[in-house]
Amino acid sequence: VPDKHIEELMLLTNNKEQISQATVINRDEKGEDSHQEKLENRNTLWYHIPEEEGNKLQVAISQMYARFCVPKYHCEFKNYEPAQFLGYPVGGHYIEHNDAETFDRGEWRRIADRDVSFLFYLNSEFGGGELEFPELGLTIKPKKGMMIAFPSYKEYVHKVHPVTWGHRYTLVSWVGTKQKLYDTIPKEGV
């Protein structure tokens, strides 16, 4: 993410009226979504992104998908979810999860039209807050300007370790593809 966009996004953290607790979405068997604040699962703040800035971000995300993901996964872009600007205060965390599926009644069920997850790190001035992929034995210390993209599926369960000092700022978005990535996921993973 260009520094100019990062600076514009960081200004949003000053508008306390546009901050809310991020929620967890649960989708039932009928496809109905419910949003729940489950602080034991996720302690994250959500910052409202104005429409104009959101549109710029979506163009940038589409370009990054074309540049970095199409050559690796060979899947055409179908749709995206608007970017979310998240803040993790001291103690902020997110338990193990994947971004598209849930295990319910003995089977995996798709709950979101997400195939590629994008994470963009907007600052480095915090402790803790590492991104971990437990099944892959991989832990990443985020740094300002870093982008991480990975399949949104159950094979890529991940979590965010609690922030120990400072405030971790992240931009997240998800892309849906015309063809599912299940058969195109590289053996080397992320």
Locations of regions flagged by a protein language model:
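Fe(II)/2-oxoglutarate oxygenase catalytic core
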Residues: V1-M147, E155-V190
